[in-house]
UniProtKB/Swiss-Prot annotation:
Segments crossing the lipid bilayer: none
This enzyme's EC code(s): 3.1.-.-
Cofactor(s) listed in the protein's UniProt record: a divalent metal cation
Family: Belongs to the metallo-dependent hydrolases superfamily. TatD-type hydrolase family.
InterPro entries tied to this protein: DNase_TatD-rel_CS, Metal_Hydrolase, TatD-like, TatD/YcfH-like
GO terms for cellular component: cytosol
Name assigned to this protein: Uncharacterized metal-dependent hydrolase HI_0454
Signal peptide: none
Binding site residues for a divalent metal cation 2: 95, 131, 156
Gene3D superfamilies in alphabetical order: Metal-dependent hydrolases
An MF annotation (GO) of this entry: DNA nuclease activity
NCBIfam families per record: YchF/TatD family DNA exonuclease (TIGR00010)
């Protein structure tokens, strides 16, 4: 079985208590058939800091972008993002988007940074990885306004409504399932995942956050993508092996790579 963790924050895991190093994390994942990881950036400085420790892994791809909750950490620099994202190891622009749940007093600034990053993704022909929270209408509006259907992308860690999902699918976007789908109170999300065609689904951990059942409350890690894969496979009425193959093919199609 070959599973891809399509979204993890490898620089944020607990290397003091739980893991020796990134190689340890990658090996634990591989032992559970999670054989390719997409490591996500949230600021450009943090991306640069993590780059040297990640570039040596053939089974780890990178995404570079500025997260809506982190964009005020340093001045947004579109030229710097463009330069960093041209690296062939970088297969996506992300994680980018809008978050009004934690920060609603800077909507205009969030939107400006988000729009700029979609434009860069289109310029480079690399997909976008979208974070959206309490901002569904504006997220869809901006994806349309900036022609995000050209570069394509994924709604990561999906927690939105059926209406949002249909609009995202209409734009050609993929939907990614995280550990949240296993939570007891996530029936509305499960309903959407049942609706979404299997050819448009990805699986992820969003490590170190949102560990799936039975690890809920503990630090998440890429190895636990297997739990997400098995759970969603059952939801879709297929074997875990078949679902792993489908979601791996989806990952390759969206990000225009062959994984190893």
């Amino acid at each position: 079985m070959f599973i891809v963790d399509s979204h993890c924050h490898l620089d944020a895991l607990d290397y003091e208590n739980l893991h020796k190093n990134i190689s340890d994390v990658v090996e634990k994942a591989h032992a559970r058939d999670v054989k390719h990881l997409l490591a996500i950036g949230v600021t450009l400085s943090r991306f640069e800091q993590a780059y040297d420790s990640l570039r040596e892994f053939n089974n780890v791809s990178l995404a570079c972008g500025v997260h809506p909750l982190d964009f005020e950490e340093e001045p947004y620099d579109a030229e710097r993002l463009l330069r960093l994202a041209q690296d062939p190891k970088v297969i996506a622009i992300g994680e980018i988007g809008l978050d009004y749940y934690y920060s609603a007093d800077n909507k205009a600034a969030q939107q400006a940074v988000f729009g700029s990053q979609i434009d860069i993704a289109n310029q480079l022909d690399k997909p976008v990885i979208i974070h959206t929270r309490s901002a569904g209408d504006d997220t869809i509006a901006m994806l349309r306004q900036h022609r995000a259907e050209k570069c394509g992308g994924v709604i990561h860690c999906f927690t939105e409504t059926m209406e949002f999902x249909k609009k995202a699918l209409d734009l050609g976007f993929y939907i990614s399932c995280s550990g949240i789908v296993t939570f007891k109170n996530a029936e509305a999300i499960r309903e959407v995942i049942r609706y979404v065609p299997m050819e448009r689904l990805l699986v992820e951990t969003d490590s170190p956050y949102l560990a799936p059942v039975p690890y809920r409350g503990k630090e998440n890690q890429p190895a636990y993508t297997r739990e997400v894969c098995e759970y969603v496979a059952t939801l879709k009425g297929v074997s875990a092996e078949a679902f792993a193959q489908i979601t791996t093919q989806n990952f390759e199609r969206l990000f225009k790579i062959r994984v190893e």
